[in-house]
């Protein structure tokens, strides 16, 4: 059994990968992404990783707060891919596939992806992903910080009322320490395995296969408008192809979606 520590995680990783990683684990941070972005701006190298047992100010997409239960897995990974802004969605898709595989390896549960950045198990959201980047004068990324937060087991007393309908955990109970170490190591192995050939976008077909929204009735939510339609496909640019109720078909690249019950 491996302890939940930086060395414990490295001990599980393949040796060639472990030698390229620099992991620091904290009991608590306000946000692993915020902490790692500061290191990135100061010149930290690719492969720098920050992990926390708990976040006091976790962040999600669109500036939302992210619920961070004590003893979850909150991990941020620094990469330096030198790509344009339009390539960032593929980093998110790659991360989602890597985490879905890691979950299946560690808890043997079917993991599905809700476009564009959430992982669901047994119909409940167990993981959120947030990728953040900075760009140079040539519009190429100076760094990308990949953040993922995973609910390992259900919190004592259940999830807060405002998210209890959608939030879930990998296990109702169990050894968090062992599972967190195994999950972190599996995620890093899958992530860097795909990152080695990210330009091929070989993960995109699997991203499509794992989609939990394709073929479903959905609502596309923006600050000024909510529209209803059906998710038809995910295109080669990782946009969601939606046939709206009015008859138009659009390739959606931004916004929030919810799956509707017909």
Label each residue range with its predicted role:
Residues 2-10, 85, 93-111, 121-262:
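Long, positively charged amphipathic alpha-helical accessory segments at protein N-termini or as interdomain linkers
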Residues 1-105, 127, 135:
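N-terminal lobe of the biotin/lipoate ligase/transferase fold
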Residues 27, 113-115:
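Short loop/edge segments at beta-strand edges and connector loops
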